[in-house]
Amino acid sequence: GKPDCAMFTAFEKKFTAVNEKLGKKQYLVSYYMSSHPGSTLKEAICLAEYMRDHHIQPEQVQDFYPTPGTRATCMYYTGYDPLTLKKVYVPKSYEEKAMQRALLQYRNPANHELVRKALLRGGRADLIGYGPHALVPPASSDGKRRKNKPADKPGRGARRR
């Protein structure tokens, strides 16, 4: 499996501190992979929340594809972690892989419908809306994307006399 987000955050802090100490301007370029063996919708939703909270907006996300000779490939084909012999969930359906990928790019309006579907399936309807923790806006009643007009925003409506 992959390390959790806390490990990445610790690495990022150490990386930044070392570069500041050395007077270097180097940046981390993260590589995101969706549908990795062991990743359920729950984990993909948690990663989307982490990305939201850390202002991470990946332009490119790669779906997991088995590569010969790797532990992840063994998990993909067998459904077991070869080191622990514990069963591992492996997302294989086109629909779930698409939802996991969309979650990592939840800010892209083209992904909103799939993200809403994933959030509902994952029991996280609380992340649909307009609040600070929402990942996507609700669907409009006609199924089309809603665009906020100035009058839709608080304090921007028609003046009352």
Positions of predicted regions on the chain:
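Intrinsically disordered or highly flexible coil/loop and linker segments, enriched in small
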Residues: 17, 21-25, 57, 70, ...
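Active-site/pore-lining binding-face segments in mid-to-C-terminal subdomains
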Residues: 50, 56-68, 78-89
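Radical SAM enzyme core and accessory elements
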Residues: 71-161
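Conserved AdoMet/S-adenosylmethionine-binding subsite of the radical SAM
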Residues: 1-63
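Flexible loop/turn segments at secondary-structure boundaries
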Residues: 35-41, 67-73, 136-137
